[in-house]
Curated annotation (Swiss-Prot):
Gene that this polypeptide is encoded by: SPPL3
Species this protein is from: Homo sapiens (Human)
Motif PAL mapped to chain: 341-343
Topological type in the membrane: Multi-pass membrane protein
Annotated protein name in UniProt: Signal peptide peptidase-like 3
GO biological process, alphabetically ordered: membrane protein proteolysis; positive regulation of calcineurin-NFAT signaling cascade; positive regulation of cytosolic calcium ion concentration; signal peptide processing; T cell receptor signaling pathway
Subcellular location: Endoplasmic reticulum membrane; Golgi apparatus; Membrane
Length: 384
């Protein structure tokens, strides 16, 4: 009886839960530092391009980076709700198109994930000169290698439907979204995460009362028809051509099998990406403070704040909050034996410590509205 009562405690050390914790944290940390490195590279390119004209614009950004403003933060949960309803009611009609679009995006994202490794492998034997492909653009050998490997992985996933390949593609999507999407201020971060918390709670806890089914869980776990199977049926290629391929579980989540093989743990990529955007923001702000004369950047903190407290980075504080929130969400799901809206736990455990620390350090006003308004220096070192 006691073993059954505390079975949730034993499940926390199961391989599936440990893998979920480690991978989600590693993806957030890696994606945040990829984002920071992209900022450094963009600054260097701007300096090089403007050195001949004698001017430098410190506020320019890369066109490939998408910054979320307040309006987008408010309407993103509404758009996500509409997309969720479309997938719930019309999944059979849109599943093939959605699967193909997801495969294309996953290919690009996983190529981005592999790019640093491919650059390391090709550096000794290949110069960084770009090869022209006409209207398709110019690419380095590392970019071509990473894209080729990504295409191969997606093709194998389509043929096998293996969960490990799906996880790899989901990891690429997580890292790419954290690296290319930016939160400009703490105000936008609070608007976005608060709206998504309400979105997550509503669709997990209350959608069953309206639609007689848990919309979030059904959409997240519903497999899609394999495009090869659909193509073989449309072209009447016969029963033995393309009919033995499996249905595909789309890479909108990370799944890991338990040590007993009896079940899979699941974590949606939104529960990694959205807190990851906040972690990316605070990492950039930590670096900004180091560039702008260290601790003198923000308004002076209260006199009772110790020097050790002043040295604690916002990134460390928020990352610990993410871990505690994810742990709490896991415990809640095990105790109640039902799906839980992870953002219900992740948002308070990340935002509240961050807001408290920013207030105590005297940085809250700056972080709230204009955290990066001044010209940054060329310092490239951050202790984490």
């Amino acid at each position: 009886m006691a073993e059954q009562t505390y079975s949730w405690a034993y499940s926390l050390v199961d391989s599936s839960q440990v893998s979920t914790f480690l991978i989600s944290i590693l993806l957030i940390v890696y994606g945040s530092f990829r984002s920071l490195n992209m900022d450094f590279e963009n600054q260097d390119k701007e300096k090089d391009s403007n050195s001949s004209s004698g001017s430098f614009n410190g506020n320019s950004t890369n066109n490939s980076i998408q910054t979320i403003d307040s309006t987008q933060a408010l309407f993103l949960p509404i758009g996500a709700s509409v997309s969720l309803l479309v997938m719930f009611f019309f999944f059979d009609s849109v599943q093939v198109v959605f699967t193909i679009c997801t495969a294309v995006l996953a290919t690009i994202a996983f190529a981005f994930l592999l790019l640093p490794m491919c650059q390391y492998l090709t550096r000794p034997c290949s110069p960084q000169n770009k090869i022209s492909f006409g209207c398709c653009g110019r690419f380095t050998a590392a970019e071509l290698l990473s894209f080729s490997l990504s295409v191969m992985l997606v093709l194998i996933w389509v043929l096998t439907g293996h969960w490990l390949l799906m996880d790899a593609l989901a990891m690429g999507l997580c890292v790419a979204m954290i690296a290319f999407v930016r939160l400009p201020s703490l105000k936008v971060s609070c608007l976005l995460l608060s709206g998504l918390l309400i979105y997550d709670v509503f669709w997990v806890f209350f959608s069953a009362y309206i639609f007689n089914s848990n919309v979030m869980v059904k959409v997240a776990t519903q497999p899609a028809d394999n495009p090869l199977d659909v193509l073989s049926r449309k072209l009447h290629l016969g029963p033995n051509v393309g009919r033995d391929v499996p249905r595909l579980s789309l890479p909108g989540k990370l799944v890991f099998p338990s040590s007993t093989g009896s079940h899979f743990s699941m974590l949606g990529i939104g529960d990694i990406v959205m807190p990851g955007l906040l972690l990316c923001f605070v990492l950039r702000y930590d670096n900004y403070k180091k560039q702008a004369s260290g601790d003198s950047c923000g308004a002076p903190g209260p006199a009772n704040i110790s020097g050790r407290m002043q040295k604690v980075s916002y990134f460390h504080c928020t990352l610990i909050g993410y871990f505690v929130g994810l742990l709490t969400a896991t415990v809640a799901s095990r105790i109640h034996r039902a799906a839980q809206p992870a953002l219900l736990y992740l948002v308070p455990f990340t935002l509240l410590p961050l807001l408290t620390m920013a207030y105590l350090k005297g940085d809250l006003r700056r972080m709230w509205s204009e955290p990066f308004h001044s010209k940054s220096s060329s310092s490239r070192f951050l202790e984490v």
